[in-house]
Amino acid sequence: MKLQEIKDFVKELRGLSQEELAKKENELKKELFELRFQAAAGQLEQTARLNEVKKQIARIKTVQSETK
């Protein structure tokens, strides 16, 4: 993700409710699980996507803690 995409993503996250953030986090965790499974099987072509998803989950958790 480029810097502007990251800023837009975080801005979008800040507009969501806690329930929506939790739902988005769960979706990304499922995607991360699938990516790890593909990586273990040697089928993953976009290896950078693993780190991208991890960082997106961390951003969601940061926004969640900001709003508590």
Curated annotation (Swiss-Prot):
Pfam families: Ribosomal_L29. SUPFAM superfamilies: Ribosomal protein L29 (L29p). One of its GO terms (biological process) is translation. CDD domains: Ribosomal_L29_HIP. Gene3D superfamilies: 1.10.287.310. Keywords: Ribonucleoprotein, Ribosomal protein. GO terms for molecular function: structural constituent of ribosome. One of its GO terms (cellular component) is cytosolic large ribosomal subunit. InterPro entries: Ribosomal_protein_uL29 (IPR050063), Ribosomal_uL29 (IPR001854), Ribosomal_uL29_CS (IPR018254), Ribosomal_uL29_sf (IPR036049). Belongs to the universal ribosomal protein uL29 family. This is Large ribosomal subunit protein uL29. It comes from Streptococcus suis (strain 05ZYH33).
